[in-house]
């Protein structure tokens, strides 16, 4: 599913929104192969044994798109780039470690600071005692704005990186910039010239990757380079010093990522996350627009030589033993799980950790292959030398709730039974279950239990897994299952309306199966728990910071006839019109017996959620002393939210929907925006007290970062807004510092 889907839901639920289509689904990471799963129990490979074929009735769609294994028609190539050849993986030289592996203390050299993706900085100039003195040091305008009438697909989500003398970032539509980290002056800009039609769910670029070549001599162009994946499916390399394309990379500095994907249309597939480089291999994933058709473009994961841009390998779920690039009229297998979340590289183990989502058509699983059932909604560790899975850990079995993993894995060490550190991985999920795994083999370090779940389900031929995994060794980032007495409203009439909705729906807890006879309540919901902001971790104190959502959904499968009556159709249907079942709201799920209707569980008249507040929380967990909750409180005030879409201006901390993550520093400060009240906060890491806040010019739905320039600490947040969160749009990167250090 998509990254921010639930945000909008929550925003309306909490704070009054005009009626809004609330499902912005995207499918996350492709997972595949036949590795063993580290979680016991059904669903990890014992799924249904159906093998899709071109002649399967349910697989036929009213639009004659490609079958899952059929030859491809010419694929969409938004960049008009020629295809390039492949390289034998054995010919790839061992690369020098990237700068992100051990950045200078004042740098922020990767999306999550460094290769561990802890979102921790060793800087300590800003403390809980002086944070209230923070002032705006400078504002940088990206110049990237939606055109009139196009704010419904806009969310920058950008986190800059800082290496040496430059702050590097991308705009919502993928222009790449280098700016002076002390003054905000633009040093260079590389324009991508991306078309609006290429935007899928939303215009977003979470960040770029810094890579140092071991083959280009220091001082020569493209010794240091910036890598970016684009919405129109290009992998681009530019010189970090000048912004010029690296001519020796791909085709004149660009690689066509549509190669091998088969039939598609602009906006169906896209890249929004910075690709990790692991031992000289740049690994790319992509999102596939949710809710379209069963045989959507593949969710394949691919590796390319970071020096030359040549293809190395592919992990294609339904071709587990074939890592080659399709040639001629062939293509990667269609409809497989894709990955839209940021991946994490591990140079020491030679692995990349891929968070995966569902196969295409999130809410119906009868057409999924056994290989797909093994690796959907999972963490898959791929060997970057071969592209083969080393291990798989599944967080939901046979997922039909859109509980794809939107978070990036965080790497840290946990004490082992012999006292020696164990290389660990923290994987937050939308369910609010946080799994802590041994990243060498994927086995749980903290206890995980398989618990009974509602089974077999009510949809013919689509049984549910009888058990689901629960991370009992970590505090759950969720509230208990809903009850009718939890229904809430601004008046007794509102509450009664919500109680009636509750009674009319199927609801037996978290894994209530989808139904076609009446709605079912999905809770925590596809925007519940942790999403793409992930978590931050302080390795010195052992404190983990997590922000999360409480946003139920009200869903219902509809027959194919009803879906047609509703005008639901996939984006690649010749008759498709915007609003006819795109990324948000209802989905056609063409090629299956059903469409899907997805709405927030709310009072559509006031725009308020039916469950009582809070709708967003922030939690600190002590990972060194029994995984205890140190503090927890609502995140976000009512100042910009209210019934009927009217801001109340009230400073009450009601806990709003939030998206975007946090940063924690050696100074003991947590920085976070994320909430729909359009503020950035500094929080005392040890007490949870908010010690400073500032109103942003737009929604802060991005991960902040902090860095040092000229001996002083700065904090940066992209206040670009988010259409799903219904927050104001701006093009401003806002940078703060203590008063003596303004640019």
Swiss-Prot record:
Q: Which GO terms describe its molecular function?
A: glycerol dehydrogenase (acceptor) activity; quinone binding; quinoprotein glucose dehydrogenase activity
Main enzyme class:
oxidoreductase
Q: Where in the cell is it found?
A: Secreted
Q: Quote the Gene3D superfamilies the UniProt record gives.
A: Quinoprotein alcohol dehydrogenase-like superfamily (2.140.10.10)
Grouped into one coarse class, the protein's main location is secreted
User: What are the boundaries of the region Disordered?
Assistant: 27-115, 445-474
Question: What cofactors are annotated for this protein?
Answer: pyrroloquinoline quinone
What's the superkingdom here?
Bacteria
Q: Where is the composition biased (Low complexity)?
A: 27-41
- Tell me the InterPro entries matching this sequence: PQQ_b-propeller_rpt, PQQ_mDH, PQQ_rpt_dom, Quinoprotein_ADH-like_sf
Q: Give the enzyme's EC designation.
A: 1.1.99.22
Q: Name one GO cellular component term.
A: extracellular region
Q: Which cysteine-cysteine pairs are annotated as disulfide bonds in the entry?
A: none
Q: Which residues form the signal peptide?
A: 1-24
**Main function:** Catalyzes the oxidation of glycerol to glycerone. Also acts, more slowly, on a number of other polyols including D-sorbitol, D-arabinitol, D-mannitol, meso-erythritol, adonitol and propylene glycol.
Q: Which family does it belong to?
A: Belongs to the bacterial PQQ dehydrogenase family.
**What is the name listed in the Swiss-Prot or TrEMBL entry for this protein?**
Glycerol dehydrogenase large subunit
Species annotation: Gluconobacter oxydans (strain 621H) (Gluconobacter suboxydans)
Which gene name belongs to this protein?
A: sldA
């Amino acid at each position: 599913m998509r990254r921010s889907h639930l945000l909008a839901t929550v925003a309306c639920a909490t704070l009054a929104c005009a009626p809004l289509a609330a499902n912005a689904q995207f499918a996350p990471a492709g997972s595949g192969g036949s590795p063993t799963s580290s979680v016991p129990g059904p669903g990890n490979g014992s799924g249904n044994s159906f093998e899709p074929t071109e002649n399967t009735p349910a697989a036929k769609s009213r639009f004659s798109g490609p079958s899952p294994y059929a030859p491809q028609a010419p694929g969409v190539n938004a960049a008009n780039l020629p295809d390039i050849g492949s390289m034998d993986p054995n010919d790839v030289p061992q690369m020098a470690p990237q700068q992100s592996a051990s950045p200078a203390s004042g740098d922020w050299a990767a999306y999550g600071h460094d290769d561990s993706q802890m979102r921790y900085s060793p800087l300590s100039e800003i403390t809980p005692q002086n944070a209230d003195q923070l002032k705006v040091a400078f504002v940088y305008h990206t110049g990237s704005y939606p055109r009139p009438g196009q704010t419904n697909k806009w969310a920058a989500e950008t986190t800059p990186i800082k290496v040496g003398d430059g702050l590097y970032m991308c705009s919502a539509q993928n222009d790449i910039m280098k700016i002076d980290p002390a003054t905000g002056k633009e040093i260079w800009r590389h324009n991508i010239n991306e078309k609006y039609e290429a935007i899928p769910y939303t215009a977003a670029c979470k960040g770029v990757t810094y890579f140092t070549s071991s083959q280009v001599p220091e001082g020569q162009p493209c010794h240091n380079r910036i890598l970016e994946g684009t919405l129109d499916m290009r992998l681009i390399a530019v010189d970090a010093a000048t912004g010029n394309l690296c001519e020796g990379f791909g085709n004149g500095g660009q690689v066509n990522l549509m190669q091998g994907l088969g039939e598609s249309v602009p906006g169906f597939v896209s890249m929004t996350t910075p690709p990790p480089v692991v031992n000289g291999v740049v690994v790319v994933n992509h999102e596939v627009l949710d809710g379209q058709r069963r045989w959507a473009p593949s969710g394949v994961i691919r590796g390319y030589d970071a020096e030359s841009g040549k293809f190395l390998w592919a992990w294609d779920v339904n071709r587990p033993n074939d890592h080659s690039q399709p040639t001629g009229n062939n293509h990667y297998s269609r409809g497989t799980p894709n990955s839209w979340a940021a991946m994490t590289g591990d140079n020491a183990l030679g692995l990349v950790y891929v968070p995966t989502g569902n196969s295409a058509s999130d809410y119906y699983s009868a057409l999924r292959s056994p290989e797909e059932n093994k690796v959907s909604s999972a963490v898959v560790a791929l060997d970057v030398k071969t592209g083969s899975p080393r291990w798989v850990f599944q967080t939901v079995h046979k997922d039909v709730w859109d509980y794809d993993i939107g978070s990036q894995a965080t790497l840290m060490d946990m004490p082992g039974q012999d006292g020696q550190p164990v290389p660990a991985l923290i994987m937050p999920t939308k369910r609010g279950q946080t799994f802590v795994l041994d990243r060498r083999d994927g086995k749980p370090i903290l206890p995980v239990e398989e618990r009974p779940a509602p089974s077999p389900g009510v949809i013919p031929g689509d049984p549910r897994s009888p058990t689901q995994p629960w991370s009992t060794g970590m505090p759950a980032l969720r509230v208990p299952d809903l009850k009718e007495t939890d229904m809430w409203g601004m008046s007794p009439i509102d509450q009664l309306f919500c109680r009636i909705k509750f009674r009319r729906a199927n609801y037996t807890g978290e894994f209530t199966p989808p139904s076609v006879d009446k709605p079912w309540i999905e809770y925590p919901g596809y925007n519940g728990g942790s999403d793409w902001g992930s978590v931050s971790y302080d390795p010195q104190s052992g404190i983990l910071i997590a922000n999360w959502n409480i946003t139920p959904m009200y869903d219902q499968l509809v027959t194919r006839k009803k879906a047609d009556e509703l005008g639901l159709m996939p984006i690649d249907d010749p008759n498709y019109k915007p609003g006819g079942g795109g990324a948000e709201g209802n989905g056609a799920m063409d090629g299956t017996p059903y469409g899907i209707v997805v709405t927030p569980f709310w009072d559509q008249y006031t725009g308020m959620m039916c469950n009582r507040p809070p709708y967003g929380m922030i939690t600190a967990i002590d990972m060194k002393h029994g995984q205890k909750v140190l503090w927890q409180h609502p995140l976000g005030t009512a100042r910009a939210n209210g019934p009927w879409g009217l801001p109340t201006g009230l400073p009450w901390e009601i806990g709003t929907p939030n998206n975007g993550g946090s940063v924690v520093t050696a100074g003991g400060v947590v920085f976070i925006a994320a909430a729909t009240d359009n503020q950035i906060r500094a929080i005392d890491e040890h007490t949870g007290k908010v010690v400073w806040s500032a109103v942003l010019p737009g929604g802060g739905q991005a991960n902040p970062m902090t860095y040092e320039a000229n001996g002083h600490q700065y904090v940066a947040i992209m206040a670009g807004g988010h259409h799903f969160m219904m927050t104001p749009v701006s093009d401003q990167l806002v940078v703060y510092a203590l008063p003596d250090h303004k640019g």
